[in-house]
Amino acid sequence: EMATVNGLPLLSETERNPMLTTTYGTGELILHAIEQGYREFVIGIGGSATNDAGVGMLQALGARFLDKDGAVLGKGGEILHRIAAINFSSVHPALKDTRFTIACDVRNPFCGPEGAAYVFARQKGADDAMIEKLDAGMQSFARLIHSTTGREITHVPGAGAAGGLGGAFLAFLNAELKPGIDLLLQTLKFSEKIKGADLIITGEGRTDRQSLMGKVPSGILEEAKRQGIPVIVVAGSIEDTEILNQAGFQGLFSIIPSPMSLETAMKPEVAKKNICRTVAQIISLVNL
């Protein structure tokens, strides 16, 4: 799970800066596992604090990224627009025998208006200028990937996940991207477990139009629709309610009862109390 080493919750708001954050730690985890003899990986790539297109991960695995003068570049999203060549001569030899399945909750392309930078970088600490620079870097890197590997990842669904990490897995590690929610629901035999249900209540920290791009609520809604079961969402914050209602959600409820800081709202005891109170009110309404 890449978020355990490169996740957004690991940084305070003042530390978040996708120009500097890197997926190097994810590469270190993979390298360690390879050296222990593992050759098959299922990796979850949600919730990252990064927008480096997976460059850091590849650096940890031995790849070197060079500028137009042949100098080795550093780390972070800020180097993307400067990458002119990639040297793979020092990558771990076992990678050629390694299989990667990537659990990916979003379907965003690598770059562009719906890509990694424009959709996700702001919550990772980017301002408007950073977002423009990151997307330009992603576009430049995508062109280099195409000229180097022959693979076109610019518009591939999921390539923009985790700040472009999905694209790196596709382009360089022959990975298979699968919706994380599909893997989860399949493992849980969800379709069988909800048979005969009158109502499904699901939730996440923040629900908005992004929730329709392969995240947990959308996966649950899709299966529930097939069985004619209404779905209600509870979340810490909710936006784009009209779009979400049109998608099929029966109702959307914020669990926050009064103004409070994000830090307070995320405390386990506070969140538990707020969730319980909100769900109790929903059930009371259903029982009318």
Where are these regions (language model features)?
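N-terminal loops that bind phosphate or other acidic moieties
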Residues: 1-45, 49-288
